[in-house]
Amino acid sequence: MDAGYTNQIFGDLYNALFSPDSETNLLAPTKYPDVKEVIDEIHGAGGIAVLAHPAFLDNFDEIDDYIEMGLDGIEVWHPSATDEDIEMLGSICKKHKLLMTGGSDFHGIYGSSTVTLGTCTTPDEHLDKLMGYKAKKKRAQRKAEKEALANAAKL
């Protein structure tokens, strides 16, 4: 902006350079890792694998595949999610006993749209389930480690 090429951060120049639909974009081709590998890495690190903002990415048709791969939860509450999206995602989570999360997707004050912290959150009851799930996974991991040590000692 200081050089005079544009008068706004997210405008015509930004779209020309960074929109995937622009013929003049500077974007490098993106190579995404295998979803199953990512889920396994998350679990291996002791994490909980949650599908981020499917309403924004419109990847509802891939959710069943992700569940089979070991998905633990879905971000249900997101600024881009409509009431219908929230209802559908909630139903999927209940059917498959998945965790339900939410968040504002705040990426700083210089986003293409104004989203403030705390505008979209995980309801307390689901936050409690998330914390309980994490504790349950830790207990199961400790139990498995103790059993492995006991079995190794028998050898």
Where are these regions (language model features)?
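Conserved acidic, metal-coordinating active-site core of Asp-based
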Residues: 1-50
